[in-house]
Amino acid sequence: MSNSMHRRDFLKSMAATGTVAMTSLPVLGATIPHSLAAGCKFFTVSQAALVESISELMIPADQFPGGKTAGVVFYIDGVLAGPFGKFYRNRYEEGLLRVDAASQKQFGGCFVSQDSDRQTAILKDLQSSDAAGSPDQEFFGLLWRHIMEGYYGDPEHGGNRDGASWKMIGFEG
């Protein structure tokens, strides 16, 4: 079974439970694209790389662009940088810290440096280890919603670059 299939299975399981995961922290030894450094208003470069990594894990590229190519991280960054993002900022900062801490504990490295199988394991462990209503459950649900909004929403809000998901579903815009 390919990594793409594992990611699709993970995406389906998270959608079924209404939860998902997200992360951020130091990106040890990872190469950060210049576009992340230049394009974010709220996220640090390492946080943006983590969110981008999770968005690609949740919506992997196949014949259509994945979360990374669609620019989901820029949509989420815009939400958090805007006036209505105040309520979510602390949740993202703490949630991303927990994801990266779990990666450090399980595999001795930051989340973005792990392969997709390890990333999936980290997110599944965090999602399933807590009771309903826990901070991780709430964060994963928030992240999932924002990833979906960033992927399928209006490109003018920073995600869905070039209307990629709209083209996928045949929406003319």
Question: What name fits each language-model region?
Answer:
Residues 15:
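Aromatic-residue-lined binding/catalytic grooves and analogous aromatic/hydrophobic interfacial grooves
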Residues 3-9, 22-58:
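C-terminal segment of N-terminal export signals and the immediately downstream linker at the start
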Residues 40-44, 61-66, 85:
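Short, N-terminal intrinsically disordered low-complexity segments that are rich in Pro/Gly
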